Amino acid sequence: MKSFYTLLLASMVSLSVSAQNVDADKVRTAQNKALRDSLSKATEVLAYHPDSIDLRLKKAAWNIQLEQWQYAKDDLDKVLFLNNTNIAGLFYRAFVNEKLLRYNFARLDYQNLLVLVPGNFQAQLGLALLNEKDKHYTEAYDGINSLIEQYPDSAMAYAAR
């Protein structure tokens, strides 16, 4: 009898987890549809305002959320062509280049960002993690140790170590 209840409980838990997975898939599908709708509207508006940096940054953000890395990179390249000191453009292009496995380009973007905003926590952390991913261990550990010295109360800096 005990095994019957155990089996019944296990099947109920399994059904509950399956229902949660189905609900999560429906939510994700709805979110992706909304992002694609926003992306298509932004593309239409960009036809009339091709030099709008804000709109291109939003479009790149939607492409990043949809994991369309190359489209995001193209928009970020245009943003940085229009304004080569755009901090958001440099940071997000570094992230996208990392996703595209273009580590040297990502490293350059992080370094250029740190020239514009020395000591930026996110840029230093991104560069250190990129160096670790690209097997530049000495630079990675130096960067993480520098972060810990600058931000001794940051749990993220310690977690990166």
Located regions from the model:
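Bacterial Sec-dependent N-terminal signal peptides
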Residues: M1-D25
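Helix-start (N-cap) detector for alpha-helical repeat units in TPR-like alpha-solenoids
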Residues: I53-D54, I87-A88, F121-Q122, A155-M156
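Alpha-helical adaptor scaffolds
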Residues: Q122, G126-K133, M156
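N-terminal leader/linker segments that initiate helical-solenoid repeat arrays
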Residues: A19-D77, F81
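Structural signature of tandem alpha-helical TPR/SEL1-like repeats
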Residues: Q31-S40, L66-K78, K99-N112, D134-S146
